[in-house]
């Protein structure tokens, strides 16, 4: 019996499966033609892949800095000399909210915000900043609930880490040639103290920073001078 000309020939199963695989792959690549659940899964996998990529980069930079950065190796050595060796495991790479690059906790060590670094130099400055806090906590027994203590460590960390170098300030939109470094250190110290739960106002943060400014800005330990 002749075939009905209006009917379509049935595709072999393997050909149909190959087409579906191609269609699905194209949809995943472009995002077009996906169901809502498929779109959600696609975004989840993309985010998961980005997290893994950011973590790998952060860990790689951390290893490089611990081995080859004069600033970081110097601070790590002085932490060890002070009786507080700081292993790699105490410096953790994690994703963070915006406007944060790192942090120090006496209980948990150093946080490195893996998705917030512009480049390795930015990470070096951040790690140096947090290692100054670690050094202060070890060497001077900082009470982080005491705003004057906190202010002093923030002044020292901003002053010594490279966080306030001129090029960083230009990127932040601050342009001044007269005492720009001091202005940056004070501004950033006040912002950090303001985030302390014991601080209830910008005026309180500024007062704490001003009260310890002279002694803490000139205290460059463990460096002989500003790096």
UniProtKB/Swiss-Prot annotation:
<dbReference type="GO" id="GO:0034982">
    <property type="term" value="P:mitochondrial protein processing"/>
</dbReference>
<keyword id="KW-0496">Mitochondrion</keyword>
<dbReference type="GO" id="GO:0033615">
    <property type="term" value="P:mitochondrial proton-transporting ATP synthase complex assembly"/>
</dbReference>
<dbReference type="GO" id="GO:0005743">
    <property type="term" value="C:mitochondrial inner membrane"/>
</dbReference>
<protein>
    <recommendedName>
        <fullName>Mitochondrial inner membrane protease ATP23</fullName>
        <ecNumber>3.4.24.-</ecNumber>
    </recommendedName>
</protein>
<dbReference type="GO" id="GO:0004222">
    <property type="term" value="F:metalloendopeptidase activity"/>
</dbReference>
<feature type="binding site">
    <location>
        <position position="129"/>
    </location>
    <ligand>
        <name>a divalent metal cation</name>
    </ligand>
</feature>
<keyword id="KW-0482">Metalloprotease</keyword>
<comment type="function">
    <text>Has a dual role in the assembly of mitochondrial ATPase. Acts as a protease that removes N-terminal residues of mitochondrial ATPase CF(0) subunit 6 at the intermembrane space side. Also involved in the correct assembly of the membrane-embedded ATPase CF(0) particle, probably mediating association of subunit 6 with the subunit 9 ring.</text>
</comment>
<comment type="similarity">
    <text>Belongs to the peptidase M76 family.</text>
</comment>
<feature type="binding site">
    <location>
        <position position="133"/>
    </location>
    <ligand>
        <name>a divalent metal cation</name>
    </ligand>
</feature>
<keyword id="KW-0479">Metal-binding</keyword>
<keyword id="KW-0378">Hydrolase</keyword>
<dbReference type="Pfam" id="PF09768">
    <property type="entry name" value="Peptidase_M76"/>
</dbReference>
<dbReference type="GO" id="GO:0046872">
    <property type="term" value="F:metal ion binding"/>
</dbReference>
<keyword id="KW-0645">Protease</keyword>
<keyword id="KW-0999">Mitochondrion inner membrane</keyword>
<keyword id="KW-0472">Membrane</keyword>
<dbReference type="InterPro" id="IPR019165">
    <property type="entry name" value="Peptidase_M76_ATP23"/>
</dbReference>
<feature type="active site">
    <location>
        <position position="130"/>
    </location>
</feature>
């Amino acid at each position: 019996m002749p075939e009905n000309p209006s009917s379509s020939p049935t595709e072999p199963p393997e050909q149909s499966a190959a087409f579906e695989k191609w269609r699905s792959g194209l949809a995943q690549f472009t995002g077009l033609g996906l169901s809502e659940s498929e779109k959600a899964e696609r975004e989840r996998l993309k985010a998961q892949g980005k997290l893994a990529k950011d973590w790998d980069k952060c860990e790689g930079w951390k290893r490089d800095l611990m081995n080859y950065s004069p600033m970081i190796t110097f601070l790590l050595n002085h932490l060890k000399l002070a009786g507080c060796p700081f292993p790699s495991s105490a410096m953790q790479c994690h994703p963070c909210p915006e406007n944060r690059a790192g942090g120090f906790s006496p209980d948990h060590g150093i946080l490195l915000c893996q998705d917030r670094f512009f480049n390795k130099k930015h990470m070096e400055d951040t790690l140096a900043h947090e290692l100054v806090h670690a050094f202060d906590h070890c060497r001077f027994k900082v009470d982080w609930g005491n705003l004057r203590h906190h202010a002093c460590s923030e002044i020292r960390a901003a002053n010594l880490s490279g966080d306030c170098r001129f090029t960083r300030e230009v990127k932040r939109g601050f342009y001044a040639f007269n005492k720009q470094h001091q202005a940056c250190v004070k501004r950033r110290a006040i912002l950090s103290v303001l985030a302390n739960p014991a601080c209830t106002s910008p005026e309180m943060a500024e007062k704490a920073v001003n009260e310890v400014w002279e002694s803490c800005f000139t205290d460059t330990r463990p460096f002989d001078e500003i790096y």
